[in-house]
Amino acid sequence: IALILPVNFNNPERMMKEADHVREDKFWCPVAHPSPMEPHVCVGQWETFTDKITIWSSSQAPFKLREALAKTLKMDLNNIRVIKMATGGGFGGKLEMLPMDFSACLLSKKAGGLPVKIVLTREEEFTTTRRKHGMIYKVKTGVKKDGTIMAMTGEVLADGGAYCSYGPTVLAAAM
């Protein structure tokens, strides 16, 4: 279990008792793999004389990418510059830190500071990037005869996979 996040507003138990009708539903959203027209792409350049990195990335989380590069490569945050290119389609699929971002920078260092560009193929998009979480929603809603919603309670179960990563963030947004 990666996250248990109770969210409470007012007193749903009392409000359910005041409702004229109570309905319980269960919804299932299957696993999905974002498939934007634009694949993941990055260009990394390790400036060998200054020992600084510049990376151009289609990441949806450029500041997280910068932090991850600094931590992984044991570098000062100020020595890493992330330039966010146009993401194009992302649908949450470009939030992850991918090995290609790190690889482009390290390959650039090995190439004497020349920029290294990595573009994933469609097949690589499906085999090396994350899918979006499948979720089961259990929802109980209490309403008045006039349609006024009095209360709603729910539970969301998400399959974050073996390496949950942004799973808790996605689950919190689902609530």
Regions found by a protein language model. Name each.
Residues 1-175:
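Structural alpha/beta core scaffold segments of enzyme domains
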